[in-house]
Amino acid sequence: MADRFKRGMTSPVRLLVRALPTRTSRIVGALLAATASALCVIPGFNVLNYYSGLAIAVVGGLLVGLTNASDPIQPTRARLRTIILGRLAQALFLACIPLVILLLNAFRVTNCDLMAGLSFYAVGPLATILIASQWGLAARLLGQTRQRSILAFLGLWLAWIGSDVISFLTEPPIFAYNAFVGFFSGAVYDDLIRIDPPLLFFRLGNLVQLGLLLAVVSPLFVAHRAAIELSRLRTVRPLQWAVAGVAVLCVGTLTGAAGYLGYDIDRETIQAQLGGTLSNDQIVLFYDQSTITPEEAALILEDQTFRLHQLQPHGRGTGCGPT
């Protein structure tokens, strides 16, 4: 009986060791479990929804990316595709740890819409963790050493998030899309947060970016050294150049259309979409010319100018130019 019990306990342990073969990956698994457990006692985050998904995406994307950047790639005869699939499988296992904990917590806290929560988890933390694992792997391939690889991934992570923070602070939109975070809604009310086409287009763009990275790195990968060698550029076949060219074209197309697809909107994009402009010496009004006539826009501009004068002492301008 004791032997049977030991064998029963050994099987899950072996599964865990196979799924998370390195010490770093097991530590990350424990940290993700701790994060999900902490969320289980925080109101609003203790169910499977947008908010818990956002928290797990931030933590999971960073940790899994760092894991893949720090874990060495063993020199083998395996193709790069096999290594990528192995890292994806590991990332998928790690992403499932918080999911299982939050699903179990549903026995304690009622989920309003479990299917919506699963959908948010799929396009949020699950996609983020899988994508971060590949950028971490790319950092390891290019950095070669553990220290350089970690610094490369951290630099990419900080630059990507920093760019979105700057855009968030300087441009009109109050939302942001990020490969390592997912979707920051900016909305206060749950009813306004939904999975819409811009988020799906954004995730498609993430996949295309990774496709370009793979198309460039794959021909340069040397399996027996587990390294990238630029000297292999001379041996790249025309078909491989063509695949890389198509990937560049796809990335360029999606990047150029990002504003119109709705996931990278700036002031110029909004002005172009609205179409109508009216101004005086104090206010520049941009309006939707498909729903507002020029006469109505003139009345709005007049009213806003009057309100601005009410806010200013003695009706004088601020000296800061048009608002």
Model-derived features: where do they sit?
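Internal/C-terminal transmembrane anchor helices
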Residues: L230-G262
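Juxtamembrane "helix-exit" motif on the non-cytosolic side of transmembrane helices
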Residues: T35-N46, V100-D113, G162-E171
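Hydrophobic alpha-helical transmembrane segments
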Residues: M1-A69
